[in-house]
Amino acid sequence: MTSAITEQLLKAKKAKGITFTELEQLLGRDEVWIASVFYRQSTASPEEAEKLLTALGLDLALADELTTPPVKGCLEPVIPTDPLIYRFYEIMQVYGLPLKDVIQEKFGDGIMSAIDFTLDVDKVEDPKGDRVKVTMCGKFLAYKKW
């Protein structure tokens, strides 16, 4: 499921004890976006790739792969087996159609962009147990009539 470069990046990140939040401060990009570069779902600029590889102590020759547009959405199998990723699949199974209806009531017939899009993860402290807050913000794209 992970490429050789993903494994190298994750291994170097662990060895250096660097967090995605720290890389966010270094690169000036969101931590989720940086993680998506690690998993080859986003493309870094040459400058971003150089900063990232330098911070991780990796060979700058790897920059070429990080700056090449990747094949996106290549998770396998179709139904994820990782428990955390599966929860998002499960959320869409339960709330996908209701979410679609609410979005279309507010915006009309269309979709939320995953290209003009941001994804943020926050920790919300709660006495009953900390909570994960995921915020998706995508441009609404109305279906064209012709």
Swiss-Prot record:
One of its GO terms (molecular function) is DNA binding. CDD domains: Cyanase_C, HTH_XRE. InterPro entries: Cro/C1-type_HTH (IPR001387), Cyanase (IPR008076), Cyanate_lyase_C (IPR003712), Cyanate_lyase_C_sf (IPR036581), Lambda_DNA-bd_dom_sf (IPR010982). The active site is at 87, 90, 113. Keywords: Lyase. It catalyses: cyanate + hydrogencarbonate + 3 H(+) = NH4(+) + 2 CO2. The keyword Lyase applies. It holds the Pfam family Cyanate_lyase. One of its GO terms (biological process) is cyanate metabolic process. Coiled coil: none annotated. Its EC number is 4.2.1.104. Gene3D superfamilies: Cyanate lyase, C-terminal domain, lambda repressor-like DNA-binding domains. Disulfide bonds: none annotated. Belongs to the cyanase family. Catalyzes the reaction of cyanate with bicarbonate to produce ammonia and carbon dioxide. This is Cyanate hydratase. The gene is cynS.
